[in-house]
């Protein structure tokens, strides 16, 4: 039986454990607005969104060479910049590994609050990334993340709730 070929989201020639800045977007399953709400440009986290934020910030404790930069927990997605600093080869952690661990941790913590029969898949199966290669691109990405709540109605992922 022939199965459809899945589109590869990662740049095949790039080492995603290499030092650098990575712009990450993680969407909820079916773009459900369960992470936050935005009214008049003001963002309010839900209980699930607060867990997602706490786990995002916890990435700073994974390894000394991994930090988070600007981030925003939107209603149905998270934007954030992950920074991988210089590290010895044996300490390498790749972006796919970090995002997999992040999504698993958030899901596990959320599932502790919900009866088994009410649990749903929280995340879409993949995520989007962009390698930030210049200082200008970093500044533009930070501005985009910072402005995202105010521009929610213009966002490609906007869903009226």
Would you name each region that the model predicts?
Residues 1-161:
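Short catalytic/metal-binding and nucleic-acid-binding patches
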């Amino acid at each position: 039986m022939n199965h459809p070929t899945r589109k590869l989201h990662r740049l095949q020639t790039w080492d995603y454990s290499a030092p650098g800045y990575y712009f990450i977007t993680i969407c909820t399953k079916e773009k459900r607005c369960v992470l936050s709400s935005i009214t008049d440009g003001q963002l309010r986290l839900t209980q699930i969104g607060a867990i997602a934020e706490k786990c995002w910030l916890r990435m700073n404790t994974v390894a000394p060479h991994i930090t988070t930069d600007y981030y925003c927990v939107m209603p149905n997605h998270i934007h954030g910049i992950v920074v991988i600093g210089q590290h010895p080869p044996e300490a390498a952690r790749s972006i796919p590994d970090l995002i997999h661990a992040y999504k698993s941790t958030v899901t596990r913590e959320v599932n502790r609050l919900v009866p088994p029969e009410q649990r749903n898949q929280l995340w879409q199966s993949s995520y989007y990334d962009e390698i930030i290669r210049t200082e200008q691109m970093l500044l533009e990405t930070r501005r985009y993340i910072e402005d995202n709540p105010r521009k929610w109605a213009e966002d490609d992922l906007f869903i009226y709730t």
